[in-house]
From Swiss-Prot:
Class in the EC hierarchy, top level: hydrolase
Protein name as it appears in the record: Nucleoside-triphosphatase 1
Species assigned in the record: Toxoplasma gondii
Active site residues of this protein: 236 (proton acceptor)
Compartments where located: Secreted; Parasitophorous vacuole
Protein origin, superkingdom: Eukaryota
Matches recorded under InterPro entries: GDA1_CD39_NTPase (IPR000407), NTPase_alveloata (IPR017227)
Length: 628
């Protein structure tokens, strides 16, 4: 490019060729001899240029979708969130954490454990759980594992697209498609104890499939090894903890929580709440510690900033986070039956008397899933995969290196009446037991839940992670550490137990965790008898308190009530007690509508997006285009 010879001369003499930024040209006072219409058009042009100049320097907001796929113990399910992003010149793009909202939850599809077990059934052969398998030989069948993963991902992708298409308007779709859609697929306790290389291989395949979506719908899904992976029990609990405190506005950069100390250092207090989350296969307990708390040397606290769960700009907090396998609703039910009905105190003449079941209820002696029929009889599913002892019995195998090479792990299995040397069917079987009958003795139910699940002599099997954090059982958690922070209990079964007692006016509507009040209410409820009506079986409550239909969801609700009583007693026995305890499914926003369900899903999003520079590199600099 060349310039006329007079241009340098103009520059030498300080003549500027650029227009002044404020006025964009000569001001109106110099426009002598110009008529009013011309001057008006000049001003319109100047204003138009100024508007465009402002657009170049201001921040721009747009919407982005985020997908969290919950690969839980019983199913795999998509959760689609929408968030506001802001892009500023020279600063990059970031997500407003307060804007994150759930716009749709998808259908439930097969769990990852089912995908792996079906693949092993086919290529390792039936009864692979009962004999040695050379895992190295199975590498030749990775392409077939890929096909199984592809079938699942196609269902999840179609379901996600259906949610996006139905929940977004056309303008929002344009923005969402342009930015790309980060996907976080995390497995929890369902495959946490799966041994060999199979689980990690499945995740390599899942990430590849997410990064290569169908081009037909126009949505650009993408992920990476940080976002799509198995998460530990402690992580699951910490993400649930972050979710709770974010949604309830306890977590934030609020200046009112901060002060400058005598040394000129900024100190921020936290007003965080703890959470007890009970899922299908595991339970998580997480709570913040008071400043100055002294823990035994064997107990490991987690600092949210040091462990990079939250950025430094958030108030610092040390928390206890522990996860127990075999304490979820399904897994604990299987283990509890196995132990209870192997005890001579409760097993007489082939009949197991279960104090946690209603009087008049009976079923065959198995840990299989139960269906309560209209005639009041209970049908037990004989499918091996529907047996609630299956995951534990698979883990407790002499063919699992965690058992064969670690004597303490084998002892834990044997302590729970599972012989690792026996075939899978025998490991799941309850010896010498044919029928289980309910007795409705709640106090005895509590004592058995306490001794089998909450305070066992040896750690429950597959709890290496919990033991490594310093806790071998739930009772030890509140003995070694405690907190005055509020505690929120969540999980479908735990909520159902409390809400059922409230519905029958056995608990006050504002019940806040008084353990003796709960024990008295549950004692009355669980002494009910099963009565067969023309429209099906009901629980006849004493003292004319009414009836409750008996079904597959509430027939063993008293065990959950007993677990809750035991948990509350241990909380109350700690050095510090929670300021209050609540049972919640979700947190409502200012409009009274739920922002999102409690659980780990929102927490895992926040864990990534709050580190704005790292998120910017992964989600925007690399983003979907990284996979092109």
């Amino acid at each position: 490019m060349w310039l006329p010879v007079y241009v340098p001369l103009l520059l030498v003499f300080g003549v500027s060729l650029s227009l002044p930024q404020g006025s964009l040209g000569t001001d109106s006072s110099s426009l002598r001899g110009v008529d009013a219409d011309t001057e008006k058009r000049i001003n319109v042009g100047k204003k138009h240029l100024q508007t465009l100049r402002n657009l170049e320097t201001r921040c721009h907001d747009s919407l982005q979708a985020l997908v969290v796929i919950d690969a839980g113990s019983s199913s795999t399910r998509t959760n689609v969130f929408l968030a506001k992003t802001r892009s500023c010149p020279n600063k990059g793009r970031s997500i407003d954490p307060d804007s994150i909202q759930l716009i749709g939850a998808g259908k439930r599809f097969a769990g990852l454990r089912v995908v792996l077990e079906e693949w092993l059934d086919t290529y390792a052969g039936k009864d692979w759980e009962s004999r040695p398998v050379d895992a190295r030989l199975l590498f030749q069948y990775v392409p077939q594992m890929h096909e199984g993963a592809k079938k699942l991902m196609q269902l999840l992708e179609e379901d996600t697209v259906a949610i996006l298409d139905s929940q977004l308007n056309e303008k929002q779709k344009v923005q969402v498609k342009a930015l790309g859609i980060p996907v976080m697929l995390c497995s929890t306790a369902g495959v946490r104890d799966f041994h060999e290389w199979y689980r990690d291989a499945l995740f390599v395949l899942l990430r590849h499939l997410i990064n290569n979506p169908s081009p037909a719908h126009g949505y650009k899904f993408f992920t990476n090894p940080f976002w799509t992976r198995p998460i530990t029990g402690a992580e699951e609990g910490l993400f649930a903890f972050i979710t709770l405190n974010h949604l309830s506005r306890r977590l934030g950069e609020d200046p009112a929580r901060c002060m400058i100390d005598e040394y000129g250092v900024k100190q921020c207090r936290n007003d965080l709440a703890g959470v007890v989350e009970v899922g299908g296969a595991s339970a998580q307990i997480v709570f913040p510690l008071q400043e100055g708390t002294v823990l035994p040397s064997s107990v490991r606290a987690v600092n949210l900033q040091r462990e990079r769960l939250l950025p430094e700009r958030y108030p610092s907090a040390d928390v206890v986070s522990v996860s127990f396998m075999q304490l979820g609703m399904a897994s604990s039910a299987g283990l509890f039956l196995k132990e209870l009905c192997s005890n001579d105190e409760f097993l007489q003449g082939g009949i197991c008397s279960n104090p946690c079941l209603f009087k008049g209820f009976q079923q065959s002696c198995s840990a299989g899933e139960v269906e309560v029929r209209p005639d009041g009889s209970a049908s037990v599913n004989e499918d091996v995969r529907k047996n609630r002892l299956k995951p534990l019995a698979t883990y407790c195998s002499v063919n699992n290196p965690e058992i064969s090479f670690k004597v303490t792990n084998e002892m834990q299995c044997r302590e729970n009446s599972i012989d690792p040397t026996k075939p899978l069917a025998e490991r799941m079987k309850i010896e010498n037991c044919s029928i289980i009958k309910g007795t409705g003795n709640f106090d005895k139910c509590v004592s058995q839940v306490e001794s089998i699940l909450v305070a066992p002599k040896l750690p429950l099997p597959a709890n290496i992670e919990a033991a490594s954090s310093g806790f071998e059982s739930v009772d030890q958690v509140f003995r070694f550490a405690s907190s005055t922070a509020p505690m929120i209990v969540t999980g479908g079964g735990m909520l159902a137990a409390i809400n059922t007692l409230k519905d029958h006016r056995l608990l006050r509507s504002d019940f806040s965790g008084d353990v003796e009040e709960l024990a008295e209410a549950a004692r009355e409820f669980c002494s009910s008898e099963v009565i067969i009506r023309t429209d099906g079986p009901v629980i006849q409550l004493p003292n004319a308190r009414g009836e409750q239909k008996l079904n597959s969801l509430n027939f063993d609700l008293c065990k959950t009530m007993a677990l809750t009583v035991s948990l509350l007693r241990h909380m109350a026995a700690g050095e510090n007690q929670p300021s209050f305890i609540k049972w919640e499914k979700s947190i409502a926003g200012p409009d009274g509508k739920p922002l999102a369900d409690l659980g780990w899903q929102v927490g895992v999003i926040l864990h990534h997006v709050l580190f704005t520079e790292e998120w910017g590199r992964n989600a925007y600099e690399a983003g979907y285009s990284h996979n092109l």
